[in-house]
Amino acid sequence: QWPRPTPQIPP
């Protein structure tokens, strides 16, 4: 399984 990208939380 490919590592899932970390969701970027807007500031």
UniProtKB/Swiss-Prot annotation:
Expressed by the venom gland. GO terms for biological process: regulation of blood pressure. Keywords: Hypotensive agent, Metalloenzyme inhibitor, Metalloprotease inhibitor, Protease inhibitor, Pyrrolidone carboxylic acid, Secreted, Toxin. One of its GO terms (cellular component) is extracellular region. It is found in: Secreted. One of its GO terms (molecular function) is peptidase inhibitor activity. It comes from the Eukaryota. Disulfide bonds: none annotated. The modification Pyrrolidone carboxylic acid is found at residue 1. Its main location: secreted. This peptide both inhibits the activity of the angiotensin-converting enzyme (ACE) and enhances the action of bradykinin by inhibiting the peptidases that inactivate it. It acts as an indirect hypotensive agent. Belongs to the bradykinin-potentiating peptide family. This is Bradykinin-potentiating peptide 11. It comes from Bothrops neuwiedi (Neuwied's lancehead).
